[in-house]
Swiss-Prot record:
Subcellular location: Cytoplasm
Cofactor note: Binds 1 potassium ion per subunit.
EC number: 3.6.-.-
Binding site for (6S)-5-formyl-5,6,7,8-tetrahydrofolate: R23, E88, R127, K462
The protein's role, per its UniProt record: Exhibits a very high intrinsic GTPase hydrolysis rate. Involved in the addition of a carboxymethylaminomethyl (cmnm) group at the wobble position (U34) of certain tRNAs, forming tRNA-cmnm(5)s(2)U34.
Domain TrmE-type G per the UniProt entry, residue ranges: 224-383
Record keyword Nucleotide-binding present: yes
Chain positions recorded as K(+) binding sites: N234, T253, I255, T258
Residues the record lists as binding Mg(2+): S238, T259
UniProt cofactor(s): K(+)
Family, similarity comment: Belongs to the TRAFAC class TrmE-Era-EngA-EngB-Septin-like GTPase superfamily. TrmE GTPase family.
Organism: Geobacillus kaustophilus (strain HTA426)
Name of this chain's protein: tRNA modification GTPase MnmE
Pfam family, one: MMR_HSR1
Amino acid sequence: MTEFDTIAAISTPMGEGAIAIVRLSGDQAVEIADRLFRSPSGKRLKDVPSHTIHYGHIIDPKSGRVVEEVMVSVMRAPKTFTREDVVEINCHGGFVSVNRVLQLVLANGARLAEPGEFTKRAFLNGRIDLSQAEAVIDLIRAKTDRAMNVALQQMEGRLSKLIRELRQTILETLAHVEVNIDYPEYDDVEEMTPRLLREKAEYVRGQIEKLLSTAAQGKILREGLATVIIGRPNVGKSSLLNALAHENRAIVTDIPGTTRDVIEEYVNVRGVPLRLIDTAGIRETEDVVERIGVERSQQMLKRADLILLVLNYHEPLTEEDERLFAMIEGMDAIVIVNKTDLPRRIDMERVKELAAGRPVVGTSLLHEQGIDELEKAIADLFFGGELEAGDLTYVSNSRHIALLEQAKTAIEDALAGIDAGMPVDLVQIDLRRAWELLGEIIGDTVHESLIDQLFAQFCLGK
């Protein structure tokens, strides 16, 4: 285990609440807490068993004044998250109380932790690997149950296990090649022929491709579908956002141009996280503020994963509607014909023709009709029910996806070398590159600056 100084931070969100926690980790964690803690029985934290919790007060050692009433948990190395001694001081929530406790802890020998430093220590001390550490932040940021389950899988080491198995296969192959080259006289070692080498390389490539086949869905679960709502002014775009978000997030009026900017909201649609973006109605306008909103709407379209195009059932199609269809040509989209509670004036056959095979859903958002059908269309368009398979290991992290793609390329370079009749000792260069790239996923072969960058994304106290 690596030796570090003792760190401390508030590990609960700031603000009013029932309980706040100050966490300490390091060799001096128990000693520092012991200087500040007084129990009614006079017991000392240094003498208590590991994984126990104790009632008492935090005392300012200089003045002897009672600062807080607390419950203190003591957990001794190595059976802790960081594999160091860990103390958690549970005090009352709020801003003043928890900060008083933290300042006393820092004044008595602890250092304020950097973002993600507790998890970083868990990684550096061998408690978790890098992909498991990254899953911690995914778990915290998960917007749906499914996204949380994917993060939990990664935290449990399912991806790590597969990566280690692939690296072991490559390593055994490399070792076999080395023995053949360095000790050709060993008759009891099977010769690594091009055919045998190809079998090993094709197996690794197949497993990498299997992982990459989950990447599109995994990335959606991790980051959410960037879903842009577009349509002419006053067709019900903001009503759609409110209906999917199940709250009044956007202003809804009968005045065209009410939404003058881009409104974003995360929503959960049947387990699929949507980063729902309500745009200003796209139309020609003289209003400077509204025109800026329209320009931003057009920019958002270029970055969207899904377009929800809203039309008015009670009005004929306009040139603006047809122009919107042209703008989203070739994109994943669902056409929503809203206000079906009113008499039909829209040409539905023309709508279906313009939709070009993409789903068309009728809604009356005023009366909350058609929302279930819309949610089903969204889930079916991207997942088609396949997400329920619990035995899949999803790859959701962009860094992991990029490294898997690079490793696959290295394996394919090795296969091309075999086909070209290159010597086995040259082919192994590409295999070793694949082994190193896979190692970067779990942190076995990764630069320290990248580790610092990854953990800097965490919140304080985690």
